[in-house]
């Protein structure tokens, strides 16, 4: 519109700019109204896929004696992708809440489940070098990888379920957890077995029940905001 200045009356470029802005706003509103929760579903699906990839990459690093200096930067990059997707989902949840979408509560629960999974997947016992040594002493490499691969496979299934509006099927990983708990008992002096058994049991519970472990008031800041007119008066 600036290039039109001098070639036509002053009000015409301003009018074109205003109409373009109005069109952009109306198009975005219509697009969001048409698809409603689908953008959030896509973000949640990507979040679960990234959690699966992060879980596999983390336990590959800890159980296959790879060089932490080479493996850690890509792992941290995956972790950052997870954090970015969590922020994106949080923003989209606020948009759905403002529009009183009927799928909001279910998608909020899926997001809370993702937060719990992220916490238990990303937690670490020590630095990678120490954990690698402890894992080797406990002879738990194969069993830990088995648990991690089971979790990752389930997360990918859930990602597709979220994206394509499917209800999740039944899930359990009792055999995998049983093998891990057996190693934890056999090597009681080694913290790796007990640490892995506890966190994988929490992950398995979330994946089985599809319910968050912890109560979170994610929309607390939204609830504190005043409507426009009361806010202006105050």
What kind of region is each of these model predictions?
Residues 1-29:
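Pore- and pathway-forming membrane helices of multi-pass small-molecule/ion transporters and channels
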Residues 31-234:
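Cytosolic regulatory and coupling regions of membrane transport/channel systems
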């Amino acid at each position: 519109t600036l290039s039109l200045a001098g070639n036509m009356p002053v009000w015409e470029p301003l009018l074109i700019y205003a109409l373009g802005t109005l069109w952009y706003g109306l198009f975005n509103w219509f697009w969001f109204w048409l698809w409603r929760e689908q953008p959030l579903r896509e973000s949640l699906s990507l979040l679960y896929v990234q959690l699966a990839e992060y879980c596999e990459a983390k336990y590959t690093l800890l159980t296959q004696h790879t060089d932490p200096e080479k493996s850690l930067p890509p792992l941290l990059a995956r972790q950052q992708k997870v954090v970015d997707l969590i922020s994106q989902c949080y923003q989209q949840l606020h948009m759905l809440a403002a529009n009183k979408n009927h799928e909001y509560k279910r998608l909020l629960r899926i997001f809370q489940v993702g937060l719990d999974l992220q916490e238990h997947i990303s937690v670490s016992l020590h630095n990678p070098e120490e954990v690698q040594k402890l894992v080797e002493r406990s002879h738990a490499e194969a069993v830990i990888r088995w648990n991690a691969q089971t979790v990752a496979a389930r997360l990918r299934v859930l990602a597709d379920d979220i994206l394509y509006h499917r209800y999740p099927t039944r899930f359990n990983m009792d055999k995998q957890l049983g093998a891990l708990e057996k190693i934890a008992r056999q090597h009681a002096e080694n913290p790796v077995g007990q640490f892995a058994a506890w966190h994988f049991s929490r992950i398995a519970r979330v994946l089985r029940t599809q319910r968050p472990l912890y109560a979170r008031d994610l929309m607390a800041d939204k609830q504190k905001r005043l409507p426009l007119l009361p806010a202006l008066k105050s």
